[in-house]
């Protein structure tokens, strides 16, 4: 018997939310982060939503404190502030291009990918094998002024992934992109029930984002600390690097004969999945899971990092619209989705207070009102 979802897509009350209009960074209201998220639900589902929503703020505050503390020294550096204003100007012309691949260039070199058997505590398929993949990334920043600084992160220049592969003929591959700080393969394996997808016949690739896991700097305080803490210009390059290395892994999968590939990701990984869906012509599906879509609006809803938004306005000499524009280059809202309509799906948590439902709602509009699944839980 098929179990019906507890929350129907139409149960989200969006009467007070804006209709998406481009350029979104100018048309989105300044109080978007504070607009309510309401659902029609029966008493049991309402209790589940409210209970899970009450849990998120505590964890969110802890994560925001960590991220804010990591970013604060760079924000307070006066000489770095003047340099940052000049650096972000380099990226403005790319926003005017029709093709996002003008900035997110396809790799021009191949990768020599090494396969290493995974440790025994990782998932071990009975009818296949599991390997760690790695290669020396040939990525170079688009902005020459950032080349030395970015490439100075030597550990970040090795790309990592874990690959589960069935014996016999190549299978369709599910690409999984983790969230901010949530990079451990074992965590995503269990939390996202990835062995279930493997047992349905998918090969699985778990991709490690830049500055996470073994790509983390030796002295970084936590995994992912350097992802957002080095200024908005370098953040653009970080997303370019994330896409570049993932594309090299995808090229490898094509060479191995995989008949199809699709991507899913959670939170920051959902954001990256949305970006990838605007760049790749042959993704069979894209399923962002509790995605964010505007980094600056998300920051405004996270205490205490929301206190740094006014500092960022001062650093970059702009307002909220200007900060959104600086980060729009990598937002899924900026570019048309290339995945066929039938292959698009968004998963949102009704009680999510990390990436609130309004973010999923915006992406749902942008993706032509594609399939949308709400679950009565949090991030």
Feature names for model-found ranges:
Residues 1-145:
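N-terminal targeting or regulatory segments adjacent to alpha/beta-hydrolase or S9 domains
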Residues 339-340, 345-348, 352:
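Short beta-strand/loop motif that positions the catalytic acidic residue
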């Amino acid at each position: 018997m098929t179990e019906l979802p507890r929350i129907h897509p139409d149960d989200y009350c969006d009467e007070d939310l804006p209709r998406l209009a481009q350029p979104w960074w100018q048309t989105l209201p300044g109080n978007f982060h504070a607009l309510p998220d309401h659902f029609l639900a029966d008493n049991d589902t309402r209790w589940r939503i409210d209970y899970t929503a009450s849990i998120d703020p505590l964890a969110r505050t802890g994560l925001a404190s960590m991220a804010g503390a990591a970013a604060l020294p760079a924000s307070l550096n006066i000489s770095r502030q003047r340099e940052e204003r000049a650096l972000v100007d380099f990226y403005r012309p790319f926003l005017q291009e029709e093709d996002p691949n003008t900035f997110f260039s396809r790799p021009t070199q191949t990768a020599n990918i090494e396969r290493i058997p995974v440790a025994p505590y990782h998932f071990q398929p009975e009818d296949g094998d599991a390997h760690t993949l790695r290669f020396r990334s040939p990525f170079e920043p688009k902005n020459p002024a950032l080349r030395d600084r970015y490439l100075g992160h030597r550990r970040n220049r090795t790309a990592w992934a874990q690959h589960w592969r069935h014996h016999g003929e190549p299978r369709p591959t599910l690409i999984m992109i983790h969230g901010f700080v949530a990079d451990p393969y074992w965590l995503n394996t269990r939390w996202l029930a990835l062995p279930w997808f493997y047992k349905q016949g998918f090969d699985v690739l778990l991709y490690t984002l830049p500055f996470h896991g073994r790509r983390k700097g030796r002295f970084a305080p936590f995994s992912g600390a350097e992802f957002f803490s080095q200024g908005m210009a370098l953040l653009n390059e970080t997303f370019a690097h994330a896409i570049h290395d993932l594309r090299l892994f995808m090229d490898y999968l094509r060479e191995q004969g995989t008949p199809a590939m699709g991507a899913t990701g959670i939170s920051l990984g959902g954001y990256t999945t949305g970006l990838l869906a605007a760049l790749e012509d042959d993704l069979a599906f894209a399923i962002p899971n509790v995605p964010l879509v505007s980094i600056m609006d998300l920051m405004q809803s996270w205490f205490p990092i929301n206190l740094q938004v006014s500092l960022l306005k001062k650093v970059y000499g702009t307002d909220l619209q200007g900060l959104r524009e600086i980060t729009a280059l990598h937002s899924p809202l900026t570019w048309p989705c290339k995945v066929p309509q039938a292959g698009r799906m968004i998963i949102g948590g009704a009680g999510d207070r990390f990436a609130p439902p309004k973010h999923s709602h915006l992406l749902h509009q942008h993706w032509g009102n594609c399939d949308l699944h709400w679950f009565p839980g949090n991030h």
